[in-house]
Amino acid sequence: MLEIDALEIDALEIDGVCKRYGDVAACDQVSFQVRAGELFGFVGGNGAGKTTTMRVVLGVVAADAGEVRWAGAPLDHATRRRFGYLPEERGLYPRMRVLDQLVYLAELHGFGVNQAHRAAEDWIARLGLREHRDAEVQRLSLGNQQRVQLAAALVHDPEVLVLDEPFSGLDPLAVDVLAAVLRERAGAGVPVLFSSHQLDLVERLCDRVGIIQRGRMVACGTVDELRAGSGTTVVVHAPGAAPGWADGLAGTTVVGVHNGRVRLRLADGVDDQAVLAAALATGPVREFSHHRPSLVELYRDAVGDGS
């Protein structure tokens, strides 16, 4: 079971969630938490279990085992009504006008008609949809339909946001607008859980990241924590060295070679000065530096050859 700090009671907790479809374990003891005011990036390959986990959170599918809690209490229908959800399969009424659709959805979440209109107009303006407010959704571009879907997840001022690929189909300007909105919501204390294949964006935006592979969580933490767990990596440029000079160095693994620069991961306890000495033995060394792996590199290390 998850151990939740008393100061983090306002957290969305996914605790030991399991879900099988026949012989396939879509979720296998999935556990993590999204703290109040936190942007949590949920990443993994296609079919890794991201969407199933989110569906369990929202009650779209029932877990076979495990529990989801908000603020320490198991979720029920009334609690989930206060969540904002962007599903993988977008669900808009194609012939309804944008404004009418958002007002209707806000009212479904308990807003009065005037409050619903104000909220709908606000999100229409913030997401750049003013010129489309009276248009039918089916007449919008896919990118603008995505903006409407995002407005639908935000219009009722949700306590928790669960967004499945929210940046999919957005142009760069819209990505920046949404990123600012998510930061603002997190700044107001809302836990924000979202999935994305855009790992550079996740690294830039998120407080913490969870990596899922074949239904199991394989890594979770801040990017710096994931870096610390990946060990020390150095980059060496020894232009006079023969190809493969580093292949036999004890306690090291060659993880990349680019333009003569060799990237080496050092095992625990290996002194980087021993690596430098080995490089100097081949001739002049023009570069010797520690490498900070990107989230893309950390992701590849975490999932290996899997998906």
State each model region's role.
Residues 1-17:
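Conserved N-terminal strand/loop that marks the beginning of ABC ATPase nucleotide-binding domains
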Residues 15, 64, 138, 253-255, ...:
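A short, local hydrophobic-aromatic micro-motif
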Residues 79, 227-230, 299-302:
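Short, flexible helix/strand-to-coil boundary loops that buttress conserved ligand/catalytic motifs
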Residues 90, 250-253, 283:
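Structural motif
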Residues 179-267:
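ABC transporter nucleotide-binding domain
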